[in-house]
From Swiss-Prot:
It comes from Listeria innocua serovar 6a (strain ATCC BAA-680 / CLIP 11262). Required for accurate and efficient protein synthesis under certain stress conditions. May act as a fidelity factor of the translation reaction, by catalyzing a one-codon backward translocation of tRNAs on improperly translocated ribosomes. Back-translocation proceeds from a post-translocation (POST) complex to a pre-translocation (PRE) complex, thus giving elongation factor G a second chance to translocate the tRNAs correctly. Binds to ribosomes in a GTP-dependent manner. One of its GO terms (biological process) is positive regulation of translation. This is Elongation factor 4. It is a peripheral membrane protein. Residues 11-193 form the tr-type G domain. InterPro entries: EF-4, EFG_III/V, EFG_V-like, EFTu-like_2, G_TR_CS, LepA_C_sf, LepA_CTD, LepA_IV. Keywords: Cell membrane, GTP-binding, Hydrolase, Membrane, Nucleotide-binding, Protein biosynthesis.
Amino acid sequence: MNKEEMNARQKKIRNFSIIAHIDHGKSTLADRILEQTGALTHREMKNQLLDSMDLERERGITIKLNAVQLKYKAKDGETYIFHLIDTPGHVDFTYEVSRSLAACEGAILVVDAAQGIEAQTLANVYLALDNDLEILPVINKIDLPAADPERVRAEIEDVIGLDASDTVLASAKSGIGIEDILEQIVEKVPEPSGDVDKPLKALIFDSVFDAYRGVIANIRIMDGVVKAGDRIKMMSNGKEFEVTEVGVFSPKATPRDELLVGDVGYLTAAIKNVGDTRVGDTITLANNPAEEALDGYRKLNPMVYCGLYPIDSSKYNDLRDALEKLELNDSALQFEAETSQALGFGFRCGFLGLLHMEIIQERIEREFNIDLITTAPSVIYHVNLTDGSNIVVDNPADMPEPGVIESVEEPYVKATVMVPNDYVGAVMELAQNKRGNFITMEYLDDIRVSIVYEIPLSEIVYDFFDQLKSSTKGYASFDYELIGYKASKLVKMDILLNAEKVDALSFIVHRDFAYERGKIIVEKLKELIPRQQFEVPIQAAIATKIVSRSTIKALRKNVLAKCYGGDVSRKRKLLEKQKEGKKRMKQIGSVEVPQEAFMAILKMDESK
């Protein structure tokens, strides 16, 4: 292909993604676009085609990214090449969304005609604007009885500030307006810029592990050209590989001779480790490297940690294998082995956020058949010690003694909640209970309000989302971003059973809430731990100070049953003997903590 043909081809390429809040119809719209452009026959079509994981279909969310190449014959008679890059919509995967948007020139913004703009719609629009994308608003689900397209159109103009005069009104389910969307993509989305003669620059926006071919990297070519046999280099770590195959997804993987500027496709190069193809990294040629990498790459660090332990300790090695397999596809997942006196052998795992954590746990239980005990999620604390050094703590059990701590800093997030104005009071009360600082509040229209708070991440990782949904009858939508660390009065609370610490039950809490939380946990454990032959004290302690205590009464055999009448000294002798036995038992007896006790503490609503 000569230079002119390449330039002509480049002018016909349109790269775009679809952004939307959960349940606004993103995957359905992608299905209709695939059908309309003839990528699939009606027979091959199944709903949510790009969401290939069962879990994605069930939860109705997109977790992994997918990219497809489509051909579309427009009304002007020309055939255009579309690359549709599917994005996850959830806040935990914000970085992945931003990288897949960086691979596009345009974005279709899908807004539900009944619900209007939600918190994550806004978050994703700002990401798209950061990447200078052309945004095409689409109001979806116009055939719903509750649809109010005019109100939503006004919201798009007022809240986001986009011109909504030529917004497409569509219904992905019924196939209304799909043609108009495709024509708008042709007219409004800019062609890819980039020069085929420059050294290769390709952005990795996702990677998956294949047992036979190694890592398959999804890439967008920004400059240059790549073909099988090229030696490539990763710009973040300098590692080199030889390309074995390049191709595109249409929607099945189809090998090609080469990928040119503007193309979105895949590349395999016998790469063994997903960690070598990090999302956002730049690929270049080893013998003719680009001078600088594409911007925006950063290493993903976990935000939330928790311990995963197999209920059946013989499955420890199976759990390690499961985590290693999941890590192949998910470079953000981190884990290391740890042991707990209470739970045995397991792993300390780091996740991007709560949804990420839930999905990994669910996949281990479902795909690998391992039943898990999970400890309470915790965040990463920065601890400044009295000797001037700093340490990072991600496990409450590792928190040093209070005497050597100068101060503790915890991560804060900026949380944006969108809610109907009837529930503003409930949301503000919840945020105050979670130690939130009020930042701002604005009315989006006469019904909806956007409220912004700064809240410690540790308060959100428990059950903030569940409580938010229940206090607003499910109407609130919520989005958060990390803003940095702030000093707080935090203390470590230990739970003692029969005067012994149970390491898996330790947690870090704000000093002002320590007494209430200690009291709740102690009462809860008293209900759940079965009675023993001896008295068991349960205590909640901060360092050496006990803040709450409860006692599980002993089970007692009636040793006097065999004395019919008889002398009182005989009875006393039997009672004394029983008392001695109980005392000895208490010294050597250990208390088994049932699985339910750990679960109850995790699920407990601690702010009450």
